[in-house]
Amino acid sequence: MLGAEPGRVLSIQSHVVSGYVGNRAATFPLQTLGYDVDVVNTVQFSNHTGYGYTNGHKTTPEQLAAIFEGLATNGLITHSRVLTGYVPGAAALQVVGEQIEKMKKDNPDCIYVLDPVMGDVGTGLYVSPDVVPIYKDMLRLATVITPNQFEVEYVTEFPVRADDRLLSGVKIDSLATLHAALIQLHTEHSLPHIAFSSIPLPISVVSTLSLPAPPHQYDRLLPTPHPPWFNAVGVGAPDEDVLVCFASSFVDGQLDTWAFALPTIDGYFSGVGDLFSAMVLAHFHPAQTSPLPALPHAVSKALLAVQQILLRTHLYSLSHAGPSGAATPRPLHAAPESVIPTDAELDSAVPLNPKDPRRKAKRMRIRELRVVQERALISQDGVGWPGQRLNWSALLA
């Protein structure tokens, strides 16, 4: 085997022919930032499942093993970084896990970002249940994990009592339960770094953290005044939720946790978590200590790119689709009253042509992340999304 190449990434996740999820959401951004990306596709689908209809096939465990064997035989497993995402079945995930373990044994410094793609709040588990224990076993191999709220709550194990019911896992609805989940993951699974991509917490809780507002680079992209589909950070009733991203490292037996408050866009998008994980991998440099430690630096840079691309994608979708799904171009900075319909309203509206079977597909197509068109946002220099280090002693007192 050749020596590890600093700029070479192995990305193991889903592939779609049309759209930007999985490897399609990760590869181009990583290449834009100068990485050489080798891709293993765990599925080959026509498009993502949000379209309502998709076709294609899953890569079998035997096929995955054959691909890894071919790479190894030719001395091509020289990757210094690995990213894994959606793997649909337990047997296939087991093959992937065994390959990662071999790579970590050969190169302990290999940076591994694990996105344990299992499900989402409101959707539930969308992989086979027997995948979950394999993911739990793979946590020990990861440098960084990037789960969403559902996945965090699913992989935490100790019981929590709520409404006289015994729940399996930690339901994160407060700073105390967040702290408990972080401690468990760091200590029981020897995880050095955790990036919770988004956790909804009540405004009343988030307001105690004194988190910075979005940066100027983001605000300048917004229409003025703010349109109704955009919820600014911290605006609303005390019991309403704010999305917060948390970056936590375990340093000398102590949590070093940073928090980043995120605005909310009322819309449906796919591939956001895949893009976020890729950007965290790209910007994570273990030796970095200034101006931020390695993980909050990577998360800060990732959030700025992802949040800007998400906003530009939403503005584009609003400017190109009316209730019929037909193209109705409008300027990106149109007056708020011209962009009031939400994605849910546009999807449920009576179409002008009800016999058009592709109406939903047209709506989904214009919501695909604009990673190519907005590539300048990926490679931009400068600061990232502002965050704040948490003082756990004070917060839990």
PLM regions and their residue ranges:
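Glycine-rich phosphate/adenosyl-contacting loop at the front of the ribokinase-like
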Residues: 1-59, 379, 385-397
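Short pre-catalytic strand/loop immediately N-terminal to key active-site residues, enriched for Gly-Thr
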Residues: 17-18, 256-271
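Non-cysteine beta-strand/loop elements that form the S-adenosyl-L-methionine
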Residues: 38-42, 111-115, 139-150
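Glycine-rich, highly charged phosphate/nucleotide-binding loops
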Residues: 55-74
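A short helix->loop->beta-strand "cap" motif at the edges of active sites that frequently abuts
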Residues: 103-112, 121, 189-192
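Conserved phosphate/ATP/ADP-binding segment of small-molecule kinases
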Residues: 127-255, 265, 284-296, 304
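Short, small-residue alpha-helix embedded
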Residues: 268-290
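Charged C-terminal helix
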Residues: 290-397
